[in-house]
Design a protein with these regions (language model features):
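Active-site microenvironment for binding and transforming phosphate-containing groups
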Residues: 1-317
């Protein structure tokens, strides 16, 4: 099994966290809580074979890039992570969470149809299986990684404006609690590169939706710019939801990288269309005394009721 080789460590002044850069051939930004127990990383746009607006590590199969290039890019990323296949959600801006068991591990890797068949209308995934590379694809929306070191469980969520207002992050936290017994106080959270507050201007109708979802607190997430327009602080909205879910602020690590102004390293749909997609990945590592699960099996057997969640999305309450 391959291991990520850390070449350097950079300090990101705006967030106060350290971002490690891994392998010059396929650079990955690593969340501070990544360890020998869990991989928690974000890709950049470098290290692949795509060209033009998709150059070069485009992982999205739905944006107009050649399928052969996307397949090779996914193969390269999987190899760098030490797995055979990525597990990729369908992503339709919902608050639906899928519990990934042995039957779902590695689904979505083969393209859009594979993702839609395995994870229809799903924007978050959770698992307690090792060696499952949960993968979310983004280009301005916030990729969020969740890790419970106590229960040894992990998750990823696609949290753009629509998904955030629908509550995809609170739903993912609830799903981890219901499925694995995860306590919010134990969760370590990584917010990857996303469109920054100053770059994300929305209209009056969208601003009204923010106010409806957050109430009076919504005024602190919106900054008027001109008549009928305001900027929206997506990352702050996610942090507010995490706080409301009882996740300690010290457990939240925001890379604070604006994709709209950081197009040298990341794709941004607002900056250029068409464009590719980069990824956030969470992958639990196998314990030294842990045997691989049999194909099609699940570890979700702590409670008979939880077995009903196998291979089925957990939908919002």
């Amino acid at each position: 099994m391959s291991h990520l080789h850390i070449l350097s460590q950079q300090h990101h002044a705006s967030s106060g966290i350290r971002v490690r850069v891994v392998s010059p051939d396929l650079p990955l930004r690593v969340f501070p809580f990544a360890s020998d127990q869990v991989t928690a990383v974000v890709t950049t746009r470098h290290g692949g074979v795509s060209t033009g607006p998709y150059g070069s590590l485009n992982l999205g199969g739905h944006v107009g890039d050649g399928p052969e290039a996307v397949a090779e890019n996914r193969r390269r990323l999987a190899a760098a992570l030490g797995v055979d296949r990525l597990t990729i959600a369908d992503q339709k801006h919902t608050a639906t969470v899928a519990v990934v068991d042995g039957a779902l591990a590695g689904r979505g890797h083969d393209g859009v149809a594979d993702s839609a068949a395995a994870f229809p209308g799903t924007d978050a995934m959770i698992t307690d299986l090792p060696d499952v590379a949960l993968t979310i694809l983004v280009a301005d929306c916030a990729p969020v990684v969740l890790y419970d070191p106590v229960r040894r469980a992990a998750g990823v969520a696609h949290s753009g404006r629509v998904g955030t207002l629908k509550g995809v992050i609170p739903q993912t936290i609830k799903a981890m609690a219901a499925t694995f017994g995860s306590a919010p106080a134990d969760l370590l959270i990584g917010i990857g590169p996303a469109i920054g507050a100053a770059s994300y201007e929305i209209g009056a109708a969208e601003a009204a939706e923010v106010m409806a979802a957050f109430g009076e607190a919504g005024t602190r997430l919106l900054t008027p710019t001109r008549p009928g327009r305001a900027t929206f602080d997506l990352a702050a909205a996610i942090r507010r939801q995490l706080a409301a879910a009882a996740v300690p602020a010290g457990n939240v690590h925001d890379m604070a990288i604006d994709t709209r102004t950081g197009t040298d390293d990341f794709f941004s749909d607002r900056a250029a269309r068409p464009c590719g997609r980069f990824a956030a990945i969470a992958r639990l590592h196998r314990a030294a005394d842990e045997s691989p699960p049999r194909a099609g099996t699940s570890v979700l057997t702590r409670s008979p009721a939880l077995t009903l969640l196998k291979s089925k999305p957990l939908r919002p309450a």
